[in-house]
Amino acid sequence: MWRLKIADGGNNPYLYSTNNFIGRQTWEFDPNYGTPEERDEVEQARLHFWNHRHEIKPSGDTLWRMQFIREKKFKQTIPQVKIEDDEEISYDKVTATMRRSVHLLEALLADDGHWPAENSGPSFFIQPLVMCLYITGHLNSVFPAEHRKEILRYVYSHQNKDGGWGLHMEGHSIMFGTTLSYICMRLLGEGPDGGLNGACTRARKWILDHGGAIANPSWGKVWLSILGVHEWVGCNPLPPEFWLFPSFLPMSPGKMWSYCRLVFMPMSYLYGRRFVGPITPLVLQLRKELYAQPYNDIKWKSSRHVCAKEDIYYPHPLLQDLMWDSLYILTEPLLTRWPFNKLRKKALATTMRHIHYEDENSRYITIGSVEKILCMLACWDEDPNGVCFKKHLARIPDYIWVAEDGMKMQTFGSQVWDASIGIQALLATELTHDIAPILKKGHEFIKASQVRDNPSGDFKSMYRHISKGSWTFSDQDHGWQLSDCTTIGLTCCLLLSTMPPETVGEKMDPEQLKDAVNVILSLQSENGGLAAWEPAGSSNWLEMLNPIEFIEDIVIEHEYVECTGTGMEALVLFKKLYPKHRTKEVESFLTNAARYLDNTQMPDGSWYGEWGICFTYGTYYALGGLAAIEKTYENCQSIRKAVRFLLKTQGEDGGWGESYRSCAEKIYIPLDGNRSTVVHTAWAMLGLMHSKQEERDPIPLHRAAKLLINSQMENGDFPQQDTTGAFKKNCLLHYPMYRNIYTLWALAQYRKKVLRQPTGI
């Protein structure tokens, strides 16, 4: 049976950590673990997901929850409550619902103080990892039989009814997801007509019916070329010479969004090397299966711009295609011939130096899953028996997650993010006796996860920004600063610093708090918005060069509403507790941030949320920022417009539910059937309470609270519903802890702001 291990280094000589692996999550298969009854419980969870996989696409993330509940012998002792029709919600019933939720959260807390959770969803994470390990000859050693079984379970679980796979688990079938998933099944041992319910046959039919694998988008073409089932001559150029560009040029690496820069870094190395894995009999067989015509008859040069219509979200502008054609026809032939090939050699060496730098500064985790696989492959190409490749192999378990829908690859983990919002939700409950043990552990985790140093050496020459004092999305070893994780980490530490240390532990050193403020201030743009990883400011026209057909706004760093809102909340609290630190800069930050929120509000009163779905999410965080600087419904038109938006989108059942299609279409779209989700309902409630809706008309809040209370399950959990996380306009991420954290937070604020505490309590 599968078991989750926390903060475990496994005595691997190729692993090292900056804080003794705090926050690390790894899964192991133990054939002797679990009783027959416990194993049957796991099988029942798998069967339940399978039977409902086309209704609720994301997993409930139940396997580790079952494990923790068993290990801690948790039993929900507080009776479940329900609100009947026409019944007035009482203070006691809300309190009981909250306490039930808190008790479950305590059982789910890991020993190091964080809540483990899945953070996945795209169909281009685990599949390329399988391809990489197949190429390097490590597939069976890294993924033994039980691992391969669970990866196949995951692939089968998310196959659409038409036989294809989407860009993410909720999406319509596309060539990219379908080709990668088909290849993944074949590399894991399924025959061309194998797989559960004819999975391979159905997938291959979808591929051939839609033009064959030649119609893959650019990333698909690259991965197929790496495997040897596509030719590099059929790809648009990815010249590593880009890494030689001086910083004053508008198209230099330092001008790019960090993720884009670091994905195309190893990709350009592999392109420059024209790297191709071993041409095995299976690879030769795949060449026959993936195309509608014989492989050797394909006109690769003319296929570079071919892409299935199902995959296109961001069509290439004509200017971009002209640029690729110029590089392809004029530049590449020169760079592969003497004497210009000396420049190519220098570029490859420079690119590899950057790869090693990023690997070392992230303890071989790298910034995320897409880059991780490519960097690992580049290190193998450099030296298959080298230490760098072995260090990469040692960090693969950090990315692997197992749930009832199988084994998948994480983005890299949401440990710090989930812990920080979870602590804030608990603090809002004011259930001091119930939450004290959780607060102490959570406080220690957040303190231990703060990044203590900047990247090594002359980090600016490596296009890196300051990170000292920041928090990452996952753990300290990851090393990559993130503005909203820093703002909520700072907020948690500030709030906990005002509480008795015997209850919540020793407060953080004020100098470390100030370091966090320095990072936040450094990431604000001239327009007042807060960027995510690095300062924004590159020219927007560079987005015309986005080569990725299925996502948008990836070339340069941008500002984000939710980062800005949490930044305002954090700095208002910091200013109150430390009024003398960079006073003018903090005041200026708040003024400019408010201006940014005013300027980015949509005509309907909402704000677009980049990292959650979508307008409900963005509006909640924007209202939090405005409320922090004492903007009110009475004195702020933006708040009045936002309230009208939220009230207008409330459903008949009292809740809110927003479709993921809002992200791509950039207009509010309710869920099919006007369904509500507990997470969207919680976000909307919190947003309305930021505006003091309870003082104007509490009825919308009563209706929403009733839905949340009645949705709570027998053990204190809430149901897993539609996916609520998103990124880059057209892709989704699954955050299963949201259903526990935001529901608790909303009910806590509802009890405090809307209901009156009975006399004597």
From Swiss-Prot:
CDD domains from the entry? SQCY_1 (cd02892)
Q: Which residues form the active site?
A: 484 (proton donor)
InterPro entries for the chain: SQ_cyclase_C (IPR032696), SQ_cyclase_N (IPR032697), Squalene_cyclase (IPR018333), Terpene_synthase_CS (IPR002365), Terpenoid_cyclase/PrenylTrfase (IPR008930)
Tissue expression per record = Expressed in stems, leaves and flowers. Lower expression in roots, stolons, rhizomes and radical leaves.
Recorded name of the encoding gene: SHS1
Q: What is this protein called?
A: Shionone synthase
EC number from the UniProt entry: 5.4.99.46
What the entry lists under NCBIfam families is as follows: squalene_cyclas
- Please give the biological process terms from Gene Ontology that the record holds: triterpenoid biosynthetic process
Q: Which family does it belong to?
A: Belongs to the terpene cyclase/mutase family.
Pfam families recorded: SQHop_cyclase_C, SQHop_cyclase_N
On whether Repeat is a keyword of this UniProt record, the answer is yes
Mark the PFTB repeats by their residue spans: 148-189, 513-555, 590-630, 639-680
As for what it does, the entry says: Also produces small amounts of beta-amyrin, friedelin, dammara-20,24-dienol, and 4-epishionone.
Keywords (A to Z) from UniProt: Isomerase, Repeat
Catalytic activity annotated for this protein? (S)-2,3-epoxysqualene = shionone
Q: Which GO terms describe its cellular component?
A: lipid droplet
A GO term for molecular function: beta-amyrin synthase activity
